[in-house]
């Protein structure tokens, strides 16, 4: 769509913004909602520690889905500059799509087998899918370097496409052995990366909605003690 319409059209048309945002963010929302539903139906907590982990992960997956929906509304309302249509359609999804995809296809959340489950060549494909958004996030935070995001978006998209084609035509087996520590570590890394990305997205969405609707001022009127 960015190639069909001029960049100025996106500044004037909330509908075009909504269409661009709908596919990647709805994918994220649906995947996390399905992941949470399937996981909750297959797992029942036993003991205090498992119960805490169970409810924490459940809330985390629900939050990811809710933030995805909130972001569609917020970023549609935001004023886009001429170059931001590329950012919202390609660069931003390259941050949250990879961890969403890996959690949905390459991880298991079953007690006793929780962790990263891919084997063989799929592991080599998953590594750049995971590292691309991680490296981009570190460079943006530490060096305020944004040009790398475009390369990261292209690389992660290519490897996700390779992974999809391989899964369709030559699927590999999943690991069913007792979970090795490195597999748990990769799952924790994916969840941590997702949590950081969605935290930034929530902060950005709330900032946009506050500018648009004055939410902070309304909150101060409702709760006067927040002025202190």
Swiss-Prot record:
Identify one Pfam family in the record.
Answer: DUF2463
Task: List the InterPro entries.
Answer: UPF0328
Q: Which family does it belong to?
A: Belongs to the UPF0328 family.
Q: What is this protein called?
A: UPF0328 protein ECU07_0040
| Organism field | Encephalitozoon cuniculi (strain GB-M1) (Microsporidian parasite)
Organism placement in taxonomy: Eukaryota, Fungi, Fungi incertae sedis, Microsporidia, Unikaryonidae
């Amino acid at each position: 769509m960015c190639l069909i319409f001029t960049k100025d059209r996106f500044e004037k048309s909330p509908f075009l913004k909504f269409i661009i945002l709908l596919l990647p963010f709805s994918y994220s929302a649906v995947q996390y909602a399905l992941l949470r539903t399937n996981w909750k139906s297959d797992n029942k907590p036993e003991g205090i520690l498992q119960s805490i982990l169970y409810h924490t992960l459940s809330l985390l997956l629900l939050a990811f889905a809710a933030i995805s929906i909130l972001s569609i509304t917020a970023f549609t309302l935001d004023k886009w500059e001429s170059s931001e249509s590329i950012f919202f359609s390609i660069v931003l999804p390259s941050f949250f799509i990879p961890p969403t995809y890996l959690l949905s296809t390459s991880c298991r959340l079953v007690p006793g087998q929780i962790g990263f489950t891919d084997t063989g060549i799929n592991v080599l494909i998953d590594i750049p899918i995971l590292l691309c958004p991680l490296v981009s996030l570190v460079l943006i935070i530490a060096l305020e370097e944004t040009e790398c995001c475009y390369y990261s978006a292209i690389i992660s998209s290519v490897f996700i496409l390779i992974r999809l084609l391989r899964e369709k035509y030559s699927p590999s087996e999943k690991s069913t052995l007792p979970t090795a520590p490195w597999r748990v570590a990769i799952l924790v890394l994916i969840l941590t990366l997702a949590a950081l990305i969605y935290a930034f997205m929530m902060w950005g969405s709330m900032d946009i909605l506050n500018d648009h609707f004055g939410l902070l001022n309304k909150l101060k009127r409702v709760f006067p003690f927040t002025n202190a």
